Amino acid sequence: DKKEEGKYHPRIGVQRDFIFRSLSEAEKNAFNKLYDQYYYHRHNDFWRQQAMKKLPQLTQSTRMLVCGEDLGMIPDCVSSVMNDLRILSLEIQRMPKNPMYEFGYLNEYPYRSVCTISTHDMSTLRGWWEEDYLQTQRYYNTMLGHYGTAPTVATPDLCEEVVRNHLKSNSI
């Protein structure tokens, strides 16, 4: 804290900051344990209690299927709470939940999920296609199974193929 020396505040993604890189390996390991505990475990019971107090009223107030945006950094309890309340998971191929994958595999999505190409705070399919040519080239070859050079623009036929593949996913 710049105003109060000796005070520290948790910050998401601090591992990419210059100050983190200046730490020794032992300090980095200790920091990462604290970071993981704070962001993923410390508040887990609190989040579960709050969810179970508020969400049942919402999910039971309608006959619609409810979908949760379970993307990014989420507490460990989110998956079990969503399962207990029968809330559908959100799956986005270019934002896979498995950090080992660059893209999600549509055939691995759970049945109780919604599979979509993007969300309200992401670029459209055509916009994404033009953002990072190397990434779209990998998508074109690995996910769509095409050989050769990917088109630089997402053509209507290409977009239709991507949408068709999403519609064939395991998701509801």
Which residue ranges define each predicted feature?
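Catalytic cores of glycan-processing enzymes that make or break glycosidic bonds
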Residues: 1-172
